């Protein structure tokens, strides 16, 4: 598991503010959501993971260093 440093966490929080819409590009998880799944950002934790409420009802995080979204 990768962790972001404080500067990266601050950058991610500016790029993904609470309430912004997110589109999943890639997720490395055995229960991964399909690419293109959309959701709403609930914040970025201190490790750099993006917390998302997906439109499917899932709450899987976008893991820093493993997954990607825009």
Predicted regions and their residues:
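Basic/aromatic-rich interaction segments and small domains that mediate binding to polyanionic partners
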Residues: 2-70
């Amino acid at each position: 598991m990768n962790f972001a440093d404080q500067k990266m966490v601050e950058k991610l929080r500016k790029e993904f503010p609470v309430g912004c819409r997110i589109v999943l590009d890639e997720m490395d998880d055995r229960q991964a959501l399909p690419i293109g799944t959309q959701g709403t950002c609930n914040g970025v934790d201190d490790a750099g993971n993006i917390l998302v409420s997906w439109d499917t009802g899932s709450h899987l995080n976008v893991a820093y260093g493993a997954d990607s979204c825009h």
